[in-house]
Structure formats: C-alpha cells, structure tokens
Amino acid sequence: MSDLEVQVPTAFDPFADANAEDSGAGTKEYVHIRVQQRNGRKSLTTVQGLKKEYSYSKILKDLKKEFCCNGTVVQDSELGQVIQLQGDQRKNVSTFLVQAGLVKKDNIKIHGF
C-alpha cells in the first residue's frame, strides 16, 4: 500500500485567535464621536465611550485649549459621562485622541451628517 496521510476532521473555532488577541482592556469598546445640529449653522460635538478611569475634565481642558472652543462634561443616565464641544470637531477630536494615545484608531466611530 502507499503512504497516504489522511486528515481527521476536528472542530475548528474561527474566533479562537481573535479572542486571544482581544484580551487587552477596552479593545472592543468603541469611542463614538457624534455631531448634533443645533439652531442655524450651530452644531455640537459629543464624545462618549472613553474609559472610566480617564479624567474627563483634564481631557476636556486639553480639547478646549487645542481647538479654541467651549465645552462641558455632561452626566447621562444611560451613556455615563459625555464630553460636549461647540462646533463640528469630529476630525479634530479623533486625531487628538489617537495622537494622545487614549484610543486606537480602529476603536473610533465617527457619526453624523
């Protein structure tokens, strides 16, 4: 007889490797950056989903200084703490969070218009 190697079918878990890589803290938690239209040309940018151990007031202070806009931290019952900034600052906030090392680029979701 010839030497044939026969593969025995076994159970395959396609998510086994993915789950092993995602063991880091907050890897699947997305940061949502939204813009809301106010009256006329005025708009409001909201940032939600940052880790709870971050100091929201310090992040807000740096964002306000960097983008020359006003802002506040709002406590929401469902969403937790949400950062609100005046104007459409979606791109600015996303690049700021990535450069500061607070969030990975893959974990940012930008919504609006």
Swiss-Prot record:
Keyword Calcium appears in the UniProt entry: no
Alphabetical keyword list: Acetylation, Protein biosynthesis, Translation regulation
MF annotations from Gene Ontology: mRNA binding; translation initiation factor activity
Cellular component terms (Gene Ontology): cytosol; nucleus
One Gene Ontology term from the biological process aspect of the record: regulation of translation
Gene3D superfamilies for this protein: SUI1-like domain
Keyword Protein biosynthesis among record annotations: yes
Modification type N-acetylserine: residues: S2
Domain of life: Eukaryota
InterPro entries: SUI1, SUI1_dom_sf, SUI1_euk
Annotated PROSITE patterns: SUI1
Function as written in the Swiss-Prot or TrEMBL entry: Probably involved in translation.
Family: Belongs to the SUI1 family.
Protein name according to UniProt: Protein translation factor SUI1 homolog 2
Species the sequence originates in: Arabidopsis thaliana
